[in-house]
């Protein structure tokens, strides 16, 4: 379990160039990607009432999302996650799964109790959650691990139908969720944001009140939950 504060902004490409140049002077690239760059695919779940979507859009103090996430279209690090947000404070529970478990989860099948993901899957199934949309984007990330600081730039955000094949390989055919000239800046920290990060990110674009999940649900074709 990890808890942190997240701030999100939507910025222009020109702002991205300015801010990323400053961030590179004080943070280091995320080691999980070449020069801190990698792609992410997240398959989100919701129920027939769109509870996960509505909790966010209705301004609920607490909202919960379940997702399966892959990196760079590879199957070596598949994660089932539950993300809980209370205002700007985020708590994440995560479990590694393999392709066999992925298939079972997508089919709504039961999971053996000895699996790490059992609790998450049981909760998700009890809520009647089924695949809702796949969100795909490219991320550029910079970190300062000793202070728990993470700054990311997400671009090329696409909405795709929620099928297993959208999590792996070179996925095509997505619908852009935001302009290709827009970037989502996320500032993440565990206690407070250092002043030098604030200085790097000063005069940023407007704060984003919706999630990539919500953006992609609205842009993509409705999936039959």
What is each of the regions a protein language model found here?
Residues 1-225:
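Phosphate-end processing signature that detects enzymes handling 5′-triphosphorylated RNA
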């Amino acid at each position: 379990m990890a808890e942190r504060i997240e701030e999100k902004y939507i910025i222009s490409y020109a702002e991205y160039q300015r801010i990323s140049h400053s961030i590179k002077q004080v943070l280091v690239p995320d080691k999980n990607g070449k020069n801190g760059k990698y792609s992410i695919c997240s398959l989100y779940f919701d129920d027939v009432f769109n509870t996960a979507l509505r909790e966010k859009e209705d301004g609920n103090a607490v909202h919960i999302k379940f997702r399966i996430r892959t990196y760079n279209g590879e199957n070596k690090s598949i994660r089932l996650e539950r993300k809980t947000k209370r205002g700007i404070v985020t708590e994440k529970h995560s479990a590694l799964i393999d392709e066999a478990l992925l298939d079972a989860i997508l089919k709504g099948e039961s999971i053996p109790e000895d699996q790490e993901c059992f609790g998450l899957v049981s909760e998700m199934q009890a809520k009647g959650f089924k695949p809702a949309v796949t969100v795909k984007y490219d991320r550029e990330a910079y970190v300062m691990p000793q202070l728990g600081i993470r700054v990311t730039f997400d671009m090329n955000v696409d909405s795709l139908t929620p099928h297993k094949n959208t999590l792996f390989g070179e996925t095509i055919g997505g619908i852009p969720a935001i302009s290709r000239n827009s970037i989502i800046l996320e500032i993440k920290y565990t206690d407070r944001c250092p002043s030098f990060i604030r200085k790097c990110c000063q005069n940023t674009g407007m704060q984003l009140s919706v999630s990539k999940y919500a953006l992609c649900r609205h842009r993509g074709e409705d999936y039959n939950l």
